Amino acid sequence: MTGGETPPFSLAVIADAHFHDIAGDYGLPGVPAGERRLTLYSWARTRESTRVFNESAAALSAALEQVAARGIRHVVLLGDYTDDGQRRTTESLARLLTRQEEEHGLRFYALPGNHDVFGPFGRHRSGDFLRADGRSVLVTSDGREPPPGAVVTPDFRCEGLPAGLLPMARFGYFRRPEFLHWETPFGLNDAPEARSYEAVSADGRTRHRLMDASYLVEPEDGLWLMMIDANVFEPRNGVFKPRSKRAFIDSTAAGWNAMLRLKPFILTWMADVAARAKATGKTLLTFSHYPVIDPLDDREGYEPRLFPGGTILKRRPEPAVAEAVSKAGIDLHFSGHWHVAGQSRRGDLVNVAVPSLCGYPPGFCVVEAKGVAVAVETVDLSALPLDADIMALYGREAARTGGGSDAVSGARDYGEFLRLHTQALVRHRYFPREWPAEVVSAIEGMRLSDLLADERTRPAGDVPPGCDADEAVIALIADWYCLRQGGALALAGLGERRIALLEQLARLYAETPEASTDRAIAAYLGLFFRAGLFHLERARGPAWPAA
C-alpha cells in the first residue's frame, strides 16, 4: 500500500453464536457455583445437540475481545445469534452488544437465523436445566399441559416477526442516524409494515403477509453490507389456526432453495444493489444465514450415500441457487447455519462458510476488503479456557444420573471440549438418527484392532503390521466428523497422529467394494473412510481464495 492509498475495510463475521445467558432469570433459582448462581442446560441435553449451550456466552465475549483488540469496528452477526430466540435471551444479548458498543466502539449488523425468530407469531420453546442436586428440570413457555415440576415462563417463548427483531433493532435492522445509507428491498421506509410480502402455500389455500428483514447498510463511506433475511416460513397446505406454529414449515431446511420460490424479489433487489455498487465503486459484501453453495463441496456425493435421511442432505442448496445468485452479480457470499468452516466455489461465486462459536471448530472470520480484493482469515478459538464450575457441575450431573459425562470434564481447553462433545454427538445423535442400525450394532464398542480383524468390518486389503492401535472406533468416527466440519482448522486440532490414522484407514478401505452384499458393513465403512479422505484433501487445500 502506498502512502496515498486508503486501507481496506475490516470487519469481523460471527456466525451461530447461539448466546445463552448463564446468569439469566428463566424462572428457576439456578445452581450455586461459588458466588454465582448459574442457569445451565443439562449435559444430557447438550450431548444430543449440535451446539453447546453453557459455553456460548464466554465464547462470544472472547471473540468480541479479540475483535476489539484487533482494532476492528464492524461486526456482522450471521444469524442464530441467540440460543433459541427466547425473549429473555434476546434481551440479554442486546444488552451485551450495547455495552460492547459503548465500551469498545463496536457496531453490529445482524440478520436472523432459524433459531432467532419463527414466522409472524412465534412458537413455544422448552429446555432441560440443571438443579443443584444434579437432576434436571424442564423450563418451557408452553403452559397448556406442562409435566409435573416444570417451570412455565413466557420469557422462554421465541417471538415472530417483527416482535423478535425489536430488542435487536439498533443492530442494523432499522435505520440509525449515523448510517450513510440504509435501505430494504422495499425502499427506504424501515417500518415493519412497509417491509412485507405475501407467502402462499403450495395448494394456494393459505396466504400470509410476512415481514422480510433484509437490508443494505453503508456504515462508512464506500462499504456496503447486504444483509439477506433468508428465513423462509412457508405456509403449509391445508387449514390451520392462524397462530399455530404448525401453520408454517420450519425454515431450518428451507434456506435458499425456498428463497427462489417464495422470495424471488430478493434476487431482483440483489441484482440492483450489485449493479449500483459496481457503478459507484462501492465495496459490496453479501451475507445470509444459509449457504448458497454446499459448504462441504461434496461433488462426489458421499453424503447422500452415507446418510440419505440426514440433516445435511435436507439443507443442501440446489445448483439453481448458485446460478441465481451468480446471475444477480454476486461473487462472494458469507453463510453460517451448518457450523462448518471452509469455502466452496461454483464458477465465479464463492461461499465462505463461517464456523460457529459453539460447535467444533469454534471460530469466526476477519475480512479485509477493498473493491474486488478480499482477504478472509478464520480465527480459531480452541485455546479458550473452560469454566471450572460448569465442568464440575457436568460431573455432578453424571454422578447423580449415572448417564456419564462423556469425558468432557477432563478437557484441557475449549477445542478439546468441543471435540469430546462431537464424540458424544456420534453416540447420542448421529448413530441413532443417521447411521444404519446394523453398522452401529457391530462397531459401537470396538477398538481399532477389533475393527480391522472382525470378518464383518475388516477392509478388503491386507492390514499392515502396526495398524492395530488401541483406539476406540467411536473416537475415530468423531475425528471424521471434526474433519468434515472443521476443514483446515481441524488439522491442527486433531494433530498429526490422528490425521495420519484417518488417512491410513481410508487407504486400507479403498479396495473394499461399495456394492458388496456379503460384507455390507465393511462396504459401508469403506465408503465412510473414503469420504474422510475427501474431507482431508479439502482441508489441505488453499485457504483463500478458493481454487
Ranges and model annotations:
Residues T46-S49, F248-M270, A277-D331:
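Active-site-proximal segments of metal-dependent phosphoesterases and phosphodiesterases across multiple
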Residues M1-F9, L267, R276, R299, ...:
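Non-catalytic terminal accessory segments
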Residues M1-T90:
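N-terminal active-site segment of His-dependent metallophosphoesterases
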Residues P8-D21, L223-V232, R236, V350-P355, ...:
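Active-site-proximal beta-strand elements of phosphoester/diester hydrolases
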Residues H20-D21, D83-G85, N114-F121, F233-R236, ...:
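Active-site environment of divalent metal-dependent phosphoester hydrolases
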Residues A110, Y302-T378:
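Conserved beta-sheet core of the metallophosphoesterase superfamily
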Residues S92-R261, F265-T268:
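Extended active-site neighborhood of metal-dependent phosphoesterases/phosphodiesterases
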Residues H18-A58, R125, R131, E234-M259, ...:
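Acidic/histidine-rich helix-loop elements
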